[in-house]
Structure formats: C-alpha cells, structure tokens
Amino acid sequence: MDINASRALANVYDLPDDFFPKIDDLVRDAKDALEPYWRSDSIKKHVLIATHFVDLIEDFWQTTQGMHEIAEALRAVIPPTTTPVPQGYLIQHDEAEEIPLGDLFKHQEERIVSFQPDYPITARIHAHLKAYAKINEESLDRARRLLWWHYNCLLWGEANVTNYISRLRTWLSTPERYRGRDAPTIEAITRPIQVAQGGRKTTSGTRKPRGLEPRRRKVKTTVVYGRRRSKSRERRAPTPQRAGSPLPRSSSSHHRSPSPRK
C-alpha cells in the first residue's frame, strides 16, 4: 500500500458516523461485492481482509443484539427505585483494550460495588450487559469502517477510493458558505473515465493514413544583388548535353571550347 492510500485509510476513522451504511446494509453490500471473488477463489489482499471483517461483524453484531434484547427484558424485573449505574462506573472501550478478557467481568463488578454495595442482582446483570454491548458497538464501528474501505477498493479501485476520501475530507473541512451544497461522490469521480471509454464514436470507411505521402518542400528565396533568386533553381541539376552540341561558354573565358569532333 502506497503512502497516499495508507493516509486515506487512516482518515476513514475521522469521517462522520452517519457517512457509513448501517451494519445490515453494509454487510449485504460487501457480500454482493465479494461474491464474484469468492466464486473464483481469489486471494487478493482486499478480498481476504474484507471477508475476515464480514465474518467478524456478523458474529459481533448478533452477539451485541442479543445483549441488548436481554438487557431490555431485565428492565421489567429491576426494582423501580433502583438508580442506574452512571457511565463513569462502566468500563469504556479504551479501558477494555488494556484488560484481559477473563478479568473484564471482575473489573466491572468491582466498579458496580464501589458505586452501590447492595446493588440489586438484576440491575447488576443489566449494567454488565449494557457495558459489554457498548464495548462491542465501538469495536463494530471500527470494523465497519475498514470493511467499507476494502470492499469499495474492490468495486472502484484503490486509487479512486483514495482520491475520493481526500476530496470528501476537503469538502467537510471547508466552511459551508464556501463549499458546494452536495458532498462529492465516488460515482461522480469515476464517471468521466467511463464516459470517455464508452462514448467514442466510430467512423465508417477507411481512414486516410498519415505520414505516408512525401511532404512538399517549401521553396525558400534569398536576395542576391537586389534580385530574388530561388534556392531550388540553384540546386537544380544541369541539363544533360546532347552529343555533338557545343558546351556553354563561360562569360569570363575568352577561349573557344575545343570541338568534340577533334
């Protein structure tokens, strides 16, 4: 990956959250783009990475959705006077990356106890599920951005996606009064190339070849003693003499030319 593509991939994390499709739509679009490569058993870089993220997102998404469903079901049995656990007592995504997976439950339980030692058990389970679902959602957000990048590189080409990310970031960073109303689209960037390839008109008949006919030489003139004399006349070969005819006499010579009969 060249340096421009590497920068564009890093800039994907800075794009607005609502720029990317929803998880279900994203996975469906990615599968449609990957289907031809799966049939041919392609081992291209973007195919392998996009396939990995499709599987990862599907598993994480189903698990996260299940956590939310169980947490919502527990709301009915939580005592109505229970105070929800504040966000500051729930483990965040950055903190979870530093904690071993086996110790995640213990760390979260210690925080809930520090908030309220006799916290109801159903409310504790609800707090755990909400914390884990939040961590999964942030991991899914990073994964879906990478999946979007790799399967769009298969659809449009890595160079076009790199160019598109650069233009989009420029548009987003420009004040609204100085930029266009609509954000640039990758279709608009690639459209001129497609039109140029498919819009050429073919002419009927044979085309006259160029460069096969000799060029006509332009006659240059020079001024000699006030008269214009053509260079073509100077370069003209002398006319051949007929046998027996006298040779032309030079104006500077005073002698007769010898007769060819002698």
From Swiss-Prot:
GO terms for molecular function: DNA binding; RNA binding; structural molecule activity. GO terms for cellular component: host cell; host cell cytoplasm; T=4 icosahedral viral capsid. Keywords: Capsid protein, Cytoplasmic inwards viral transport, DNA-binding, Host cytoplasm, Host-virus interaction, Microtubular inwards viral transport, Phosphoprotein, RNA-binding, T=4 icosahedral capsid protein, Viral penetration into host nucleus, Virion, Virus entry into host cell. Residues 183-262 are annotated as: Disordered. Residues 215-234, 252-262 have a biased composition (Basic residues). It comes from the Viruses. InterPro entries: Hepatitis_core (IPR002006), Viral_capsid_core_dom_sf_HBV (IPR036459). The modification Phosphoserine is found at S232, S245. A motif (Bipartite nuclear localization signal) lies at residues 215-233. Self assembles to form an icosahedral capsid. Most capsid appear to be large particles with an icosahedral symmetry of T=4 and consist of 240 copies of capsid protein, though a fraction forms smaller T=3 particles consisting of 180 capsid proteins. Entering capsid are transported along microtubules to the nucleus. Phosphorylation of the capsid is thought to induce exposure of nuclear localization signal in the C-terminal portion of the capsid protein that allows binding to the nuclear pore complex via the importin (karyopherin-) alpha and beta. This is Capsid protein. It comes from Duck hepatitis B virus (strain Germany/DHBV-3). The gene is C.
